[in-house]
């Protein structure tokens, strides 16, 4: 459910992006959108991982949507946005994009750890089976 609600927010965000007239801001927003979609693909594949990226859902996603809606509204009403405000928005979008990449890395690291654990378990079982076979063979050849 958390994933679906978050994805709905990204879809709302995606609808805002084309309406942004400032090409630099629109470009940064598209980058953030791409990174968010990659993260959601990972989460749909492994829904249990949502706990690992909880801060994305509890803070970043709502903030992203809020600042985007406010900026789009200002543009729509013809307001002149100060250069400092524009630069701050771009900076925040870049930071959110980086945070999304970090969240993706966090999920991949978890998958890597799971794979390593599974490989170690398989290796241990195979080693034990090999040792057991050796013992059984030695008993067959030398019962005493």
Annotate each language-model stretch with its function:
Residues 1-44:
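Membrane-proximal, non-transmembrane interface segments of integral membrane proteins
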Residues 41-53, 58-144:
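Long amphipathic all-alpha helical oligomerization modules
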């Amino acid at each position: 459910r958390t994933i679906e609600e978050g994805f709905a927010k990204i879809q709302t965000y995606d609808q805002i992006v084309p309406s942004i007239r400032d090409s630099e801001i629109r470009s940064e927003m598209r980058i953030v959108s791409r990174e968010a979609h990659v993260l959601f693909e990972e989460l749909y594949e492994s829904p249990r991982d949502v706990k690992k990226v909880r801060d994305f859902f509890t803070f970043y996603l709502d903030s992203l949507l809020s600042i985007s809606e406010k900026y789009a509204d200002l543009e729509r009403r013809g307001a002149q946005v100060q250069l400092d405000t524009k630069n701050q928005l771009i900076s925040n979008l870049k930071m959110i994009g980086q945070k999304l990449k970090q969240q993706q890395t966090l999920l991949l690291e978890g998958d890597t750890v799971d794979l390593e654990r599974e490989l170690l378990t398989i290796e241990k079982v195979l080693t034990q089976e090999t040792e057991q076979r050796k013992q059984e063979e030695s008993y067959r050849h030398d019962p005493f």
